[in-house]
Amino acid sequence: MVNPSYEPLYVTYLVYFNRDRDYFECHEVLEELWLKLDRDPVYKGLLQIAVGLYHFRNGNYRGGYMMLDSAVHRLEHAASHALGINMAKLVDEARACARQLAEAVMEGSGELQRQPPVYRDLTIEIVEPGLRQAVEKALSSVPVNIPQQRGPRRGEKHEQRQQALEASIRRRQAAGSLRSATVETKDAP
C-alpha cells in the first residue's frame, strides 16, 4: 500500500530528479510545495540542490556553488533518512559538488575555459519502501518533459523580437552591399 502522507509534489520532484534529471522541473514542483508548507527549510534545501545542479550543468559555476553550498548548510543537520530518502548521502554528494565548484571558481575564468569542472548527475536514494512505491507508481503518470529545459530560455515574445531584429540586420546588410556595389560601379573607369 502506498503511504498517502507523501505529498504528490514531493513524489513528482523525485521522479523528475532521478528519472529525468530535469532540475528545472524539480524547482518548479518543489517550489510550489515549499510555499504551501510555509517555506519548510528541508524542502528549500532539496529545491536548492536541484537549482545548483541546473546551474552547474549549464556552466554557471558560481551560481551552482552558491546554491549547493546553501543547500548543504540547510540540510546537514536533517535526520539521515529525513523525508524517506538517504539525506546524509545526498548532502555528502552535494557537498562534494560544491567543493569542486568552489575550487573551480577560485582558480579563475582562464582555468575554467581550459578545464571546466566535470559535471555529474546525482541520484536521490529512496530508503522508505512506501515512498519508493509512490515514486514507482508516479513514473507512468508524470510526463517526461521533452525537450528538457537545459539552458536559459526566454518566451515567445523574446523570440519574435529576436527574429525581427535579425531580419532588420539582414535587410540593412543587403541594402549596404547594394549601395557599395553602386558606388563601385560609378567609380569604375
Task: Show which residues each predicted segment covers.
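Structural register within alpha-helical repeat arrays
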Residues: T12-Y13, K44, V51
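Residue at a conserved register position within TPR or TPR-like alpha-solenoid repeats
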Residues: Y16-F17, Q48, H55, A102
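Helix-turn-helix repeat elements of alpha-solenoid scaffolds
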Residues: F17-V29
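TPR-repeat structural position
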Residues: D22-Y23, Y61-R62, L68
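Alpha-helical solenoid repeat scaffolds, predominantly canonical TPR units
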Residues: V29, Q48, M67-R74
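Boundary/linker segments of alpha-helical solenoid repeat arrays
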Residues: D40-V42, L75-K89
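Alpha-helical linker/edge segments of TPR/alpha-solenoid repeat scaffolds
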Residues: L53-N58, D92-L112
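A hydrophobic membrane-anchoring alpha-helix module
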Residues: M106-P189
